[in-house]
Regions:
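Sec-exported extracytoplasmic/periplasmic mature domains
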Residues: 123, 138, 142, 154, ...
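Extracytoplasmic
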Residues: 86-89, 111-116, 125-128, 133, ...
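Terminal targeting segments of Actinobacterial cell-envelope proteins
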Residues: 1-41
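Second-shell loop/turn segments in exported
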Residues: 102-107, 147-155, 170-175, 226-234, ...
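Entry/capping segment at the start of metal-dependent catalytic domains
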Residues: 28-125
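Flexible, polar/acidic helix-loop-strand segments at domain edges
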Residues: 186-268, 273, 348
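Amphipathic, coiled-coil-like alpha-helical scaffolding segments used for oligomerization/assembly
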Residues: 150-210
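C-terminal solvent-exposed extensions
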Residues: 69-74, 79, 86, 99-100, ...
Length: 349
């Protein structure tokens, strides 16, 4: 074979092994379908839309619920220095008088336990405290002489109570809020129950409260607050501890930052709340959150020192003066540390 023939043969062999010509058959490849991805994206988008609608709907409902809270005209309140925030403000919080059965007739009578509390937030936005005033302590009620504190409400209105406490303490009160304990069961159920501590076993309405920690649902929370075997002042402590337990759980479990739980919790709160007419919707929500934060700190809950003269409960003037100064100077926690006997016990009788 000549060299020329060999080269031509090799060239033909190389051509046959080379790339396919334009006329050669190319294997068919099925295009991958994008339909599953499209369906997934549409589904995800729909879910996101539903979530957004649900969140917007939740906040709209919450705003409506807060707007529906009764507003009360209360004279004697002082406009806050920083109205855009709740820092450096003092709130007067009361409850309807609650007797052993909680009937309307009992709510119009004196002598039953009722909550009178000054809730103060520090000006720096860090901390504060709650000061409970016994409703049966005798003080000067303007226009009525020396009377039990709660009579200021019974004989007048929230305005007279504000005037009485301002005269007693020298503390400017910025806002007023009133709780209705007849609706406490709904709130306790909405947050999934609470825990309270009882120092000794008791029995009320046929329900046994064991010594130590008790898990309360809505109904048993009412039993706890109205136990007829507990005297009035101790029943007041139970109500305060129940309020503290409720708002502690709301804060610790972040129930007001979760859109799912927020609606149910705020709905329950608004059903038992009335506030002064200067309260804005954001003020109310902020108050609930701030109260919850402080509720977890037992050192910031104190009871006004009193003493007994004859058969009457009267202020302990010397200690009380220090407490009023502590409120004005944002130092309730320091007062409680100096005077531990004034700290409200979490284990109410």
């Amino acid at each position: 074979m000549s060299d020329t023939t060999q080269i031509e043969d090799e060239a033909r062999a190389g051509q046959s092994a080379g790339p396919a010509s334009d006329h050669q058959a190319v294997p068919f490849r099925r295009k991958r379908s994008r339909r599953p991805l499209r369906v997934a994206l549409i589904t995800l988008g729909s879910l996101l839309c539903l979530v957004i609608v649900a969140v917007i709907g939740s906040y709209a409902y919450v705003n409506h619920a807060i707007t529906s809270i009764p507003r009360l005209r209360v004279a004697g309140l002082v406009a806050p220095v920083t109205p855009s925030t709740l820092d450096g403000q003092t709130f007067l919080i009361t409850s309807y008088p609650v007797g052993p059965t909680g009937t309307p007739a009992e709510q119009t009578q004196s002598g039953y336990s009722n909550l009178v509390m000054l809730f103060h937030t520090n000006a720096n936005g860090k901390g504060g405290g709650a000061v409970t005033l016994p409703g049966d302590v005798r003080v000067t009620v303007p226009g009525h002489g020396n009377e039990p504190l709660w009579d200021a409400m019974q004989k007048g209105s929230p305005s007279l109570l504000v005037q009485t406490i301002t005269k007693l303490t020298g503390v400017s009160i910025n806002h007023y809020a009133r709780l209705d304990f007849t609706h406490i069961a709904g709130l306790v159920n909405a947050i999934g129950g609470v825990e309270v501590t009882v120092p000794a076993a008791t029995k009320g309405f046929g329900y046994k409260f064991v010594k130590g920690v008790n898990n309360l649902t809505g109904v048993t929370a009412i039993y706890y607050a109205r136990d007829p075997t507990v005297k009035g002042q101790d029943r007041l402590l139970r109500q305060e501890n129940l309020v503290r337990a409720v708002f502690t759980k709301i804060a610790n479990d972040h129930l007001l930052t979760n859109p799912v739980t927020m609606v149910h919790v705020l709905k329950a709160i608004t059903s038992m709340l009335a506030v002064d007419s200067n309260f804005t919707n954001s003020d109310i929500e902020s108050l609930v959150k701030q109260f919850g934060k402080l509720a977890a700190d037992t050192g910031t809950f104190v009871t006004v020192p009193t003493k007994t003269v004859g058969t009457n409960l009267v202020p302990n003037t010397a200690l009380d003066a220090q407490l009023w100064t502590a409120i004005k100077q944002d130092s309730i926690a320091a007062f409680a540390k100096t005077h531990p006997s004034t700290v409200t016990p979490q284990a109410a009788p």
